[in-house]
Amino acid sequence: MKFFAFSMLIGEASPIVLALRRTTLEVRQLDPIIRSELEQGSSSSCPKAILIFARGSTEIGNMGVSAGPAVASALEAYGADQIWVQGVGGPYTADLPSNFLPGGTSQSAINEAVRLFNEANTKCPSTPIVAGGYSQGTAVMAGAIPKLDAVRARVVGTVLFGYTQNQQNNKGIKDYPQEDLQVYCEVGDLVCDGTLIITVSHFLYLEEAAGPAPEFLKSKIGA
C-alpha cells in the first residue's frame, strides 16, 4: 500500500462526505456504536453466537458507525439475548497512521482481537464465533485469525468490507477456510486493489452489511 488520498480535495458537498453522512444517519437508527457483551457477559448464560467486529479507521466507539452496527442489528433477528456483540477497542484505536504498518494495522490491535477471540472460547466454549471488519478493521481480523491456533476452528464465519489486505492476501485470510470467508469489495474501492487510495466506493457497504453479510453468517451459525 503506497498511497493514501483520504484528504484529497474533500469538500463539504463531495460524494465522499455525502456518503459518509448518509451512512452515519442510517446506521444510527440500527445499533449502538459501543458493544461489549462478550466482556460483560456471564459464562452461565452463553448466547447462540458471538460476533466480534473491528471498525474502520477514525470510526468512533468500538463498533464504528457503518458496517459493524448494521451486521450486529441484522444478527439480532435471533433475539437480542441470543447474540453477544463485541467490538475491538482498547489498544485498537483505529488511527490512520496504522494503515501504513506491515499488515495494515498495529500489532497491539491484532493482539486485542486475539484476546477477545480467546475470551469467547474460554467463556463460552460451545458457542460459535463469527467475525467481521471494515476498512482497517479487515486488517485487524486478517492479522488476528491466523494467530488463533485451535480457537480458529471455532470462528465459523467471517465477513470483510473494503478489505485493505485483499490483494496482499490473495482475497483470503492465511490458514482460514475460504468457504467460511466472505469479502465485499465495491467496484471502484481501490483499497481492495492494494492501495490506500480512498474513493467514495469505500463508504458504500451498508447494503451488504445489512443484508448479504449477516445472512452468510447466519448460514454458518445455523438455525
From Swiss-Prot:
InterPro entries: AB_hydrolase_fold, Cutinase/axe, CUTINASE_1, CUTINASE_2, Cutinase_monf. It catalyses: cutin + H2O = cutin monomers. The record marks S57, Q136 as: Transition state stabilizer. The keyword Calcium does not apply. Its EC number is 3.1.1.74. It is found in: Secreted. One of its GO terms (cellular component) is extracellular region. The active site is at S135, D189, H202. It is an enzyme of class 3 (hydrolase). Catalyzes the hydrolysis of complex carboxylic polyesters found in the cell wall of plants. Degrades cutin, a macromolecule that forms the structure of the plant cuticle. Allows pathogenic fungi to penetrate through the cuticular barrier into the host plant during the initial stage of fungal infection. This is Cutinase. It comes from Didymella rabiei (Chickpea ascochyta blight fungus). The lineage of its organism: Eukaryota, Fungi, Dikarya, Ascomycota, Pezizomycotina.
